[in-house]
Curated annotation (Swiss-Prot):
Annotated positions binding a nucleoside 3',5'-cyclic phosphate: 135-252
Protein name, as recorded: Rap guanine nucleotide exchange factor 2
Entry-linked SUPFAM superfamilies: cAMP-binding domain-like, PDZ domain-like, Ras GEF, Ubiquitin-like
Compositionally biased region (Low complexity): 1025-1038, 1110-1124, 1140-1159, 1440-1455
Organ and tissue specificity: Expressed in the brain, heart, lung, liver and stomach. Expressed in the granular layer of the cerebellum. Expressed in Purkinje cells. Expressed in cortical neurons and coronary artery smooth muscle cells (at protein level). Expressed ubiquitously in the brain.
Organism: Rattus norvegicus (Rat)
Modification note: Ubiquitinated by NEDD4, leading to proteasomal degradation. Phosphorylation by PLK2 promotes its activity.
Length: 1496
C-alpha cells in the first residue's frame, strides 16, 4: 500500500498532507496559505475565493434557513441595485462560492485503508466507483463487493517503469485505475492497457506466467490488486451462492445469495437473470430484504425485453382474481402509476387496463386502494396542450362539459365525440380544462366557459387528466338528482370582486394541502371569513410565508392518505386565495397535494408586481399573484389611483411597441391571468377609461419603451442570468421521464421519442455556442474582455445554483478555439478572473473518470435541486449498457438492468425537490444580505436569503409587506434576462466563429493565445499533450528547427524544477531498483514499487515541498483548459512570477531567456531573508547570448515561497548580464538593445511581457517607460576587475554596486502598492534585453553567429542538474556601456516580420550540448521527441547527493535521440570551444550538496 505523505515540516502544506491527496487533487490551487505574503488576506479577498470555505453557506443551508426562519423575516425595502455594479463585482459576486470546489477524494481514502479496516460504507463507495470499469463487467454485485473488500491499492510513480517482465510468475489480478501500461510481446507486438482494463491471473490456483514485458506509459499509474488466492476464492464462491430455478428441465431463473453488510442481518437471494415470463411472475412473489427495488427496477426496464406493457397488464388483471395475490398486484399497479404514468397516458390499451383495474377495486370494495390510485393518477398527470378549430362560431362543440365554479368544481369533459378532431387531438373523458386561449378556466362558471368556447373558432386548450375529482363531481351530481335539490355552498357567496390578492394568513402545510373534501359545504372563497382574516393580517403583520414550506412531507410516501394531506380533518378554511381551489372538493385541490409531490404549480402568493400606467403617464405598482385576473388588477388600480368611478368603466389595456416602432394597443379579457408573465419589455399596462378614446402612449414614450427593450448581455445581472439558466435547465431536466433514458439507451421506439431528453441534451451545445457567439460578435476589445469576465461570473453563480450543466457549457464556450485564440483580449482579463476560471474548469478535470466532479456531486451537503452534467450521465449509462451483456445464457441479464435502473433513480433524485425550484435558485443574492428578487412565476420566491456572519445565520426581522418598486425592478431584470435568452441568435458553425474570431484579432502569428492555457495548435511533429499546469501547454513546433536553446536566469522567479505530482517524488530511472526487487511476485512487485516511491519521497522532502509550491499552481494534465492566461495568480503576493507565459512547464516559471527574448530580473536585496545563497553567471559573449546561473538553497520553512521572489527584490539585477558578460565589459549596441526590446514586445505568447496586463497593446510605450528609464547606468563606467563568477558568487556585491538605489526605489514602490496590474507592468521592463545575438532566426529562436553557423545550445530540461560551463570566448570590451532609448522606435517596422517571437521550448525538449554539436548547418531532419516523452523526461530529478564535478554538463537527452535515457555527459577536455571556462569552474559548485542548481 502506498503510505501517506510524511507530515510537512515547512508549515505551509501541512493541512493538506494530513491525508494523502490523490495525484490530481494536489494540482488544485489550495488556499491554505500557500503564500506567506498573503496570509493576512481574508479568504474573501484572496484571488481564489472559489476554493475558500469562508463559512459561506451552501444552498442546502440557505434552504433550511428559509424553512426555519421565513416567519421571522422583515422584508422592508432593502437597497439593492438591479445590475451588478462594477464596484461590487469584484468584492461581492465572486467571493461567496457556496462551498470549496476541492473536496476529499473519498474513493482514494477508502483505497488507502488497509482492507481489514474498511467499513461497509467504504466498500459501498468503492463499489460505486468500480462498477463503471470494464474489468468488472458481467460480474454480479456480490462478486464486486467481495473484490472491493480485499483489493489493495498501489501506485507506480514513473513512466517507463517495468511492472512485469516476460516469464515472471503472476500472483494477482490487477485493474488499472489511472494511467496506462504497454505490454510488449516477444514477437515485437505491443498492446496498451488503460483505465478500467485488467491483467494478471485467471480464477484458478494454477501457476501462471507473464507473457511479454509490461511498462507504465505515464507517471502516477494507479492499480488495485487482488491476490490470486482471494480472486480465485471469490470467483469460485459465486457458483456455490447461485440458486437455479428450473421448470421442465430448463433453467428459467438464477438467484444469488448475498449479504449486504457484515452484520448478517441483510442477507438473502436476489434475482440475477431469468426469462421474461419468470421475471414478470416474480413481481408478485416474496422479495428478500436484499432485493427491495425489484418491482421498481422491473417496471422501468421491462420495455427492454417485453414488446408491450399489456403483457404485464394482462397478467396483473389475471392475478388480481387470486385473493392471495390481490394486495401484491395492487401494490405493483400503484407503483407503476406513480413511477411511470406516461406508460398509461396516450396509450388507449393501458388506459382501458387502468379503468378495468379501478372497476375491480370498486367491485372488491377496496376503497382505500382506489382512492390512492386516483390520487396517484391526478398527481402524476401532466398538462397537455391541444389546438382545436371550428368551421364557424355556430358549429357545435365536439364535447360535453360538466362542473363550474357555481358547483365548486372546475370545468370537466364529460364525453367526446369519438369521430371528432377533439378525440384525435387527445381530449378524453375526465380531462379538466385548465386554460383556453390564455384565459384561466380553473375558477369559472360553466355558462361563461361555454360562451368563450363557442365564441372562438380557434381554441388553444390546456387540459389535465383528473379522474379523482371528476368522479367526485359525478357523485355530487347523482346526489343532487336523488335529493332533487342542487348542492349550494353554505358559507358566503361567490362574488369575485371580494377576492383579495394579498394572502390572508400564514398557512401551515396542513392548511395548504388540507383543503379536504370532507366538509363538502365549505367554500374556499368566503367573504366574511376573508375580511376578518384581512383585518387580523393588517393588525398583526403576520408573515405571508409558510413557516415550513413542505418540510414535513415525505416525497416518496404517496400511498398514504395522511401524507398527501387528505386526512379526515375538520374543515380548515382555505387561507390561500388560490383561484383554482375555490372549493374544498375542487379538482385543483389535488394540486395542493400535487404541489407537494411535483410542484408543477405553485401556491398563490402575491409575489409579482405590475406597473400600471394611466393616460397621463402616472404609474402605480400593484402586487398580484400568478392567478390574479385582469379584472382584479383594474379594481386594485382604481383604488391605487384613487379614481372614483366603478370598475366596470375601466379596463386593462396592453400597449406594446414593435421593433419597427408601431404602437399596438389591445384590451385584455377580464379573465386573463399570469399578467406579469405576459408583459413584454416593450410593453406597458394602462388603465383605460372605456368611455374615452385618448392616446395612452405618446411617440416619445414609445421610443423610450423601444430603447428599454434593447438589451445586451453586459446590462444583465450575472446572478439573474445564472438563475434563469438554472431554472430553464432544471425545468427541462425534471421533465425527463425515467423511461426516456431507457428508450434512448436501448434505442427503443416510444410515443414520446425521448423529446425531453433531447431538449436537455441540446441545451449544453446551445449554451456553449452562445458564449462563443456573444464574445466574437463584440468588436470592441475592452467590451470583449468584460463579456468574458461576465461569463466567468455567470459560471460561478451557476456553480452556486448547482447547475453543473450550464457551468460546463460556459467553460467549454470559453475554451472553444475561436475564443481561446483571442490573445490580447484574454490578457486584459484581471488575474482574479483568470484564477477563478481555472478553478472552475478544474472541477471538470477528466482524469480518473471525472473524479473531482463526482466527489462534489456526491458531497454530503449537495441537496436537490442539482442539475448534473448531462454528458457524464450519458457516459455512465452507456458504459453500463455496453459493458454488460443484455442476455446471458439465453436469460435476461437482470443484474445489468438493476444497475441501470439504480443509476437512473440516482439521477432522478437530483430533480426531486420539495420546493419550487424557482425559489431554490433564487435564494442567493449578493452577500446573502439584500432582498432576493422574486421569480417571475415562482410562488414562495419571497423567502429571503440569510445574512451570513462568520458562517452563522443571522436572524433578521423584516416586514412582510415588500417594497413593491424593488420587486418590480427585480422582476423587470428577470424579464430582461428571459427576453434576452429567448431571442438569442446562436452561431453554431465553428467556421463562421473562426471567421469572426479573425475579424476580432487578425492572425499575427500561428501560435495559440497564451501557451499557458490557450488551446494548443496541433502540428505534425508535436502531438498535443495534456497540459500539466499553468505554465505548461504543448507548443506547436517548427518542424525543421533544431531544439531551441533555453536559458535560466534567475532563481528569483524560479522554482527549482518541480514534479507534476508533488506528493509522489520522481527520481531518475537509474536510481530505481529493478521493478519487483523485493519480491518475485507481481502483487508485491507493484506494492514494493509503490513503497520505494514513498521512501524516495521521505528522503527528498525538501525537493518535494518545492514541488508542491509550484504544483499547487498547476491543474490536472487533462483539464479542459488548465491555467491562468497570464502566468500564476501568485503575483498576488507581489511576485513577478507571471513572466513565464511560455510553453515551459510549471516546472519552470523561470522560462527560457533567449527564446523568450527576455531576461529575468534577479533578486538581490534581502538575500539573507530569502536564503538565496549566490548565483553564477557565465555569459557567452561571442554568441551574444547572456546567461546567468543562479544557485539557491532554501531553508525548509521557505520552500513553498522562497523561490517566488517578491517584486521588490527583483529589480536590482536588470541587465546585469549585459554588464558583466566576461571579465571585461562589452558595449551594448543600440541595435541589439532595441531589437531585444522589440522582440520581447512582439514575442506574443513567447515572451514574459505577454503576461503583463495590457502590455501588448502599447508594448513600445511600456518598453520605453519601463525598460530604459530604469537603467541607472546609461553611461556608467565599471572598473570592477574580478572575474565574473567572483562577482556573482559574492552574494550580489556587484548588484549592490550597480543597483542599490533602484533596488530600494522599487522596494518602496512595491511595499506601497500590491496591485497585480502594476506588478505585472513593472515586470515587463525586465524582459527588454532579449536577444544579444547579432541575428535572430525569425521564428525559431535559434541564435546565429555572424558567420552563419547555427549554434543550438543546450536547453533546460527542467530538471535538477548541475550548472554547466558554456562556450564563451573572451572578447575585449570597452568599459563603457551606452544604453539609450533613442533608437527604440527605429525597429518597429521589423516587428511584424521576421523578428516575430518563436514558441518557447517546451520542457524536456533537450538541446544538444555544444561539445556534441557538429560545426556546420543544422540538420533539417532532426525532430524533437514526442511531447509526452519529453514531458516525462523533464521530470527526472537528479539527487543532490550526486551533484557532479564542476566540469560536467547536464544530461544530454537530446532531441534527436528520443529513446535515450538521461545519462551524464562528460565533455572532452580537449574540446577547444570549452577551453575558456574549463579552468575557471564554478566557485560554489560543491559548496553545499543540498543546493538546488538550475541547468542551462
Amino acid at each position: 500500500m502506498k503510505p501517506l505523505a510524511a507530515p510537512a515540516n515547512h508549515g505551509v502544506l501541512g493541512q493538506q498532507e494530513k491525508q494523502s491527496l490523490p495525484a490530481d487533487f494536489t494540482k488544485l490551487h489550495l488556499t491554505d496559505s500557500l503564500h506567506p505574503q498573503v496570509t493576512h488576506v481574508s479568504s474573501s479577498h484572496s484571488g481564489c475565493s472559489i476554493t475558500s470555505d469562508s463559512g459561506s453557506s451552501s444552498l442546502s443551508d440557505i434552504y433550511q434557513a428559509t424553512e426555519s426562519e421565513a416567519g421571522d423575516m422583515d422584508l422592508s425595502g432593502l437597497p439593492e441595485t438591479a445590475v451588478d455594479s462594477e464596484d461590487d463585482d469584484d468584492e461581492e459576486d465572486i467571493e461567496r462560492a457556496s462551498d470549496p470546489l476541492m473536496s476529499r477524494d473519498i474513493v482514494r481514502d477508502c483505497l488507502e485503508k488497509d482492507p481489514i479496516d474498511r467499513t461497509d460504507d467504504d466498500i459501498e463507495q468503492l463499489l460505486e466507483f468500480m462498477h463503471q470499469l470494464p474489468a468488472f463487467a458481467n460480474m454480479t454485485m456480490s462478486v464486486r463487493r467481495e473484490l472491493c473488500a480485499v483489493m489493495v491499492f498501489a501506485v507506480v510513480e514513473r513512466a517507463g517503469t517495468i511492472v512485469l517482465n516476460d516469464g515472471e510468475e503472476l500472483d494477482s489480478w490487477s485493474v488499472i485505475l489511472n494511467g496506462s501500461v504497454e505490454v510488449t510481446y516477444p514477437d515485437g507486438k505491443a498492446e496498451i492497457l488503460c483505465m478500467g482494463n485488467s491483467f494478471g491471473v485467471s480464477p484458478t490456483m494454477d501457476k501462471e506466467y507473464m507473457k511479454g514485458v509490461m511498462r507504465t506509459k505515464v507517471d502516477d499509474c494507479q492499480f488495485v490488486c487482488i491476490a490470486q488466492q482471494d480472486y480465485c476464492r471469490i470467483l469460485n464462491q459465486v457458483e456455490k451462492n447461485m440458486q437455479k430455478v428450473e421448470e421442465e428441465g430448463e433453467i428459467v431463473m438464477v438467484k444469488e445469495h448475498r449479504e449486504l453488510d457484515r452484520t448478517g442481518t441483510r442477507k438473502g437471494h436476489i434475482v440475477i437473470k431469468g426469462t421474461s415470463e419468470r421475471l414478470t411472475m416474480h413481481l408478485v412473489e416474496e422479495h428478500s430484504v436484499v432485493d427491495p427495488t425489484f418491482i421498481e427496477d422491473f417496471l422501468l426496464t421491462y420495455r427492454t425485453f417485453l414488446s408491450s406493457p399489456m403483457e404485464v397488464g394482462k397478467k396483473l388483471l389475471e392475478w388480481f382474481n387470486d385473493p392471495s395475490l390481490r394486495d401484491k398486484v395492487t401494490r405493483v399497479v400503484l407503483l407503476w402509476v406513480n413511477n411511470h404514468f406516461n406508460d398509461f397516458e396516450g396509450d388507449p390499451a393501458m388506459t382501458r387496463f387502468l379503468e378495468e383495474f379501478e372497476n375491480n377495486l370498486e367491485r372488491e370494495k377496496m376503497g382505500g386502494h382506489l382512492r390512492l390510485l386516483n390520487i396517484a393518477c391526478a398527481a402524476k398527470a401532466k398538462r397537455r396542450s391541444m389546438t382545436l378549430t371550428k368551421p364557424s362560431r355556430e358549429a357545435p362543440l365536439p364535447f360535453i362539459l360538466l362542473g363550474g365554479s357555481e358547483k365548486g368544481f372546475g370545468i370537466f369533459v364529460d364525453s367526446v365525440d369519438s369521430s371528432s378532431k377533439a378525440t384525435e387531438a387527445g381530449l378524453k373523458r375526465g380531462d379538466q380544462i385548465l386554460e383556453v386561449n390564455g384565459q384561466n378556466f380553473e375558477n369559472i362558471q360553466l355558462s361563461k366557459a361555454m360562451e368563450i368556447l363557442r365564441n372562438n373558432t380557434h381554441l388553444s386548450i390546456t387540459v389535465k387528466t383528473n379522474l379523482f375529482v371528476f368522479k367526485e363531481l359525478l357523485t355530487r351530481l347523482s346526489e343532487e338528482k336523488r335529493n332533487g335539490a342542487p348542492h349550494l355552498p353554505k358559507i358566503g357567496d361567490i362574488k369575485k370582486a371580494s377576492r383579495y390578492s394579498i394572502p390572508d394568513l400564514a398557512v401551515d402545510v396542513e392548511q395548504v394541502i388540507g383543503l379536504e373534501k370532507v366538509n363538502k359545504k365549505s367554500k374556499a372563497n368566503t367573504v366574511g371569513g376573508r375580511n376578518k382574516l384581512k383585518k387580523i393580517l393588517d393588525k398583526t403583520r403576520i408573515s405571508i410565508l409558510p413557516q415550513k414550506p413542505y418540510n414535513d412531507i415525505g416525497i416518496g410516501q404517496s400511498q398514504d392518505d395522511s401524507i398527501v394531506g387528505l386526512r379526515q380533518t375538520k374543515h380548515i378554511p382555505a387561507a390561500l386565495p388560490v383561484s383554482g381551489t375555490l372549493s374544498s372538493s375542487n379538482p385543483d385541490l389535488l394540486q395542493s397535494h400535487h404541489r407537494i409531490l411535483d410542484f408543477s404549480t405553485t401556491p398563490d402568493l402575491p409575489d409579482q408586481v405590475l406597473r400600471v400606467f394611466k393616460a397621463d403617464q402616472q404609474s402605480r405598482y400593484i402586487m398580484i399573484s400568478k392567478d390574479t385576473t385582469a379584472k382584479e388588477v383594474v379594481i386594485q388600480a382604481i383604488r391605487e389611483f384613487a379614481v372614483t368611478a366603478t370598475p366596470e368603466q375601466y379596463s386593462l389595456c396592453e400597449v406594446s411597441v414593435t421593433p419597427e416602432g408601431v404602437i399596438k394597443q389591445r384590451r385584455l379579457p377580464d379573465q386573463l391571468s399570469k399578467l406579469a408573465d405576459r408583459i413584454q419589455l416593450s410593453g406597458r399596462y394602462y388603465l383605460k377609461n372605456n368611455m374615452e378614446t385618448e392616446t395612452l402612449c405618446s411617440d416619445e414614450d414609445a421610443q423610450e419603451l423601444l430603447r428599454e427593450s434593447q438589451i445586451s448581455l453586459l446590462q444583465l445581472s450575472t446572478v439573474e442570468v445564472a438563475t434563469q439558466l438554472s431554472m430553464r435547465n432544471f425545468e427541462l431536466f425534471r421533465n425527463i421521464e425515467p423511461t426516456e433514458y431507457i428508450d434512448d439507451l436501448f434505442k427503443l421506439k416510444s410515443k414520446t421519442s425521448c423529446a425531453n431528453l433531447k431538449k436537455f441534451e441540446e441545451v449544453i451545445n446551445q449554451e456553449t455556442f452562445w458564449v462563443a457567439s456573444e464574445i466574437l460578435r463584440e468588436t470592441n476589445q475592452l467590451k470583449r474582455m468584460k463579456i468574458i469576465k461576465h461569463f466567468i461570473k455567470i459560471a460561478l453563480h451557476c456553480r452556486e445554483c448547482k447547475n453543473f450543466n450550464s457551468m460546463f457549457a460556459i467553460i467549454s464556450g470559453l475554451n472553444l478555439a475561436p475564443v481561446a485564440r483571442l490573445r490580447t483580449t484574454w490578457e486584459k482579463l484581471p488575474n482574479k478572473y483568470e484564477k477563478l476560471f481555472q478553478d472552475l474548469q478544474d472541477l471538470f478535470d477528466p482524469s480518473r473518470n471525472m473524479a473531482k466532479y463526482r466527489n462534489v456531486l456526491s458531497g454530503q451537503n449537495l441537496q436537490p435541486p442539482v442539475i448534473p452534467l448531462f454528458p457524464v450521465i450519458k457516459k455512465d449509462l452507456t458504459f453500463l449498457h455496453e459493458g454488460n451483456d443484455s442476455k446471458v445464457d439465453g436469460l435476461v441479464n437482470f443484474e445489468k438492468l438493476r444497475m441501470i435502473a439504480k443509476e437512473i433513480r440516482h439521477v432522478g433524485r437530483m430533480a426531486s425537490v420539495n420546493m419550487d425550484p424557482a425559489l431554490m435558485f433564487r435564494t442567493r443574492k449578493k452577500k446573502w444580505r439584500s432582498l432576493g428578487s422574486l421569480s417571475q412565476g415562482s410562488a414562495n420566491a419571497t423567502v429571503l436569503d440569510v445574512a451570513q456572519t462568520g458562517g452563522h445565520k443571522k436572524r433578521v426581522r423584516r416586514s412582510s409587506f415588500l417594497n413593491a418598486k424593488k420587486l418590480y425592478e427585480d422582476a423587470q431584470m428577470a424579464r430582461k434576462v428571459k427576453q434576452y435568452l429567448s431571442n438569442l441568435e446562436l452561431e453554431m458553425d465553428e467556421e463562421s466563429l473562426q471567421t469572426l474570431s479573425l475579424q476580432c484579432e487578425p492572425a499575427t502569428s500561428t501560435l495559440p493565445k497564451n501557451p499557458a492555457d490557450r488551446k494548443p495548435v496541433k502540428s505534425e511533429t508535436s502531438p498535443v499533450a495534456p497540459r500539466a499546469g499553468p505554465q505548461q501547454k504543448a507548443q506547436p513546433q517548427q518542424p525543421l528547427a533544431p531544439p531551441q536553446p533555453s536559458h535560466k536566469v534567475s532563481q528569483g522567479l524560479q522554482v527549482p524544477a518541480v514534479s507534476l505530482y508533488p506528493s509522489r517524488k520522481k527520481v531518475p530511472v537509474k536510481d530505481l531498483p529493478p521493478f519487483g526487487i523485493n519480491s518475485p511476485q507481481a502483487l508485491k512487485k507493484i506494492l514494493s514499487l509503490s513503497e520505494e516511491g514513498s521512501l524516495e519521497r521521505h528522503r527528498k522532502q525538501a525537493e518535494d515541498t518545492i514541488s508542491n509550491a509550484s504544483s499547487q499552481l498547476s491543474s490536472p494534465p487533462t483539464s479542459p483548459q488548465s491555467s491562468p492566461r497570464k502566468g500564476y495568480a501568485l503575483a498576488l503576493s507581489g511576485t513577478v512570477d507571471n513572466f513565464s507565459d511560455s510553453g515551459h512547464s510549471e516546472i519552470s516559471s523561470r522560462s527560457s531567456i533567449v527564446s523568450n527574448s527576455s531576461f529575468d530580473s534577479v533578486p538581490v536585496s534581502l538575500h539573507d531573508e530569502r536564503r538565496q545563497r549566490h548565483s553564477v553567471s557565465i555569459v557567452e559573449s561571442n554568441l551574444g547570448v547572456g546567461r546567468m546561473e543562479r544557485r539557491t538553497l532554501m531553508e525548509p520553512d521557505q520552500y513553498s515561497l522562497g523561490s517566488y521572489a517578491p517584486v521588490s527584490e527583483s529589480r536590482g539585477l536588470y541587465a546585469a548580464a549585459t554588464v558583466i558578460s566576461s571579465p571585461s565589459t562589452e558595449e551594448l549596441s543600440h541595435d541589439q538593445g532595441d531589437r531585444a526590446s522589440l522582440d520581447a514586445a512582439d514575442s506574443g505568447r513567447g515572451s514574459w511581457t505577454s503576461c503583463s496586463s495590457g502590455s501588448h497593446d502599447n508594448i513600445q510605450t511600456i518598453q520605453h517607460q519601463r525598460s530604459w528609464e530604469t537603467l541607472p547606468f546609461g553611461h556608467t563606467h565599471f572598473d570592477y576587475s574580478g572575474d565574473a563568477t567572483g562577482i556573482w558568487a559574492s552574494g550580489g556585491h556587484m548588484d549592490q554596486i550597480m543597483f542599490s538605489d533602484h533596488s530600494t526605489k522599487y522596494n518602496r514602490q512595491n511595499q506601497s502598492r500590491e496591485s497585480l496590474e502594476q506588478a505585472q507592468s513593472r515586470a515587463s521592463w525586465a524582459s527588454s534585453t532579449g536577444y544579444w545575438g547579432e541575428d535572430s532566426e525569425g521564428d525559431t529562436g535559434t541564435i546565429k553567429r555572424r558567420g552563419g553557423k547555427d549554434v543550438s545550445t543546450e536547453a533546460e530540461s527542467s530538471s535538477m542538474v548541475p550548472v554547466t560551463t558554456e562556450e564563451a570566448k573572451p572578447v575585449p570590451m570597452p568599459a563603457h556601456i551606452a544604453v539609450t532609448p533613442s533608437t527604440t522606435k527605429g525597429l518597429i517596422a521589423r516587428k511584424e516580420g521576421r523578428y516575430r517571437e518563436p514558441p518557447p521550448t517546451p520542457p524536456g525538449y533537450v538541446g544538444i550540448p555544444i561539445a556534441d554539436f557538429p560545426e556546420g548547418p543544422c540538420h533539417p531532419a532532426r525532430k524533437p521527441p514526442d511531447y509526452n516523452v519529453a514531458l516525462q523526461r523533464s521530470r527526472m530529478v537528479a539527487r543532490p547527493t550526486e551533484a557532479p564535478a564542476p566540469g560536467q554538463t547536464p544530461p544530454a537527452a537530446t532531441a534527436s535521440r528520443p529513446g535515450s535515457k538521461p545519462q551524464w555527459h562528460k565533455p572532452s577536455d580537449a574540446d577547444p570551444r570549452l577551453a575558456p571556462f574549463q579552468p575557471q569552474g564554478f566557485a560554489g559548485a560543491e559548496e553545499d550538496e543540498d543546493e538546488q542548481v538550475s541547468a542551462v
